[in-house]
Amino acid sequence: MMSVLSDQLVTFSILAYLVAMVVHAVEYALGNARVRVGPPARELVGAGVGAAGGAGSGPEPTDGAATAAQRTAARARMAGLGAVAVTVLAALLHLGALIARGVAADRMPWGNMYEFVLTVSFIGVASWFVVLWKRPTLRRLGLFLTLVMVLLVATAELLLYTPIVPLVPALNSYWFIIHVATVVFSSGIFLLGVVPAGAFLMRAGYEQGRRSFPYLLAKRMPAAAALERLTFVLHAFSFPIFTFAVIAGAIWAEAAWGRAWGWDPKETWAFISWVVYAGYLHARATPSVKRNVASWLAILGFLTVMMNLFGVNLFFEGLHSYGGLD
């Protein structure tokens, strides 16, 4: 019963994230809309008037044009608030699916790839609400976040779904809660962090005068400096948690397998992720390193996390090969 409910809630959450993405796109489109301003009405002036005052002065918005611009801005704002409301609904459905899954399994819902992806993506969207509460001006990033949510949750539902089964013996430990919880939480923050990192690269290019794709998408994004700052804050917050997760995993491995580190594929890729993210923070703190270089390192770090999640579980054999897929 609870398992079926969880599956249904996941499906509804995907649809809700999709609707939120569309409404965010409407806000984006309205924000890019231009109000046509007609030429000013001709006036009869004296022969000596206009040489100084009229030359070079462009058309000024009429009252009608100003009103139209205000209406468009109001509609864009309403669409943005509506998109946030639908995203909240999607996140509640998402959370309900995780709770129902945990109740049905009588354990934390982190036992396989399907459950892990659902949990990481939920942490990402929940963290987004905290960012939005602190920085409402960043709302338009929601378009790209909801796109990521649709892709991840739909991938979990369509390709990674696994019926509820008991945990494999290797996971029956209190370290399961400690290690996996910190991995899930830090991965969710890294997921959110890659969104402003990519947005920064587009916005920085737009501010430098680039008008080709994809830089034109950044026309209505927040300022590049704000996006870059958010990228740093999220990664600086998540990196110590991820570091603890790696250490906790080594302690658990010592207790379970008799060695703390054996260069198992998942351990190797966790180390690669740690090195890349450490490199990002070092680059970010080095004045001589350009911000776009540091942002590319943040994106590379997330790609290594995705490799560790999908690639290692699907293509490698090791002690961590219990992703739940046949």
Label for each model-derived stretch:
Residues 1-326:
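Polytopic transmembrane helical bundles with strong interfacial aromatic enrichment
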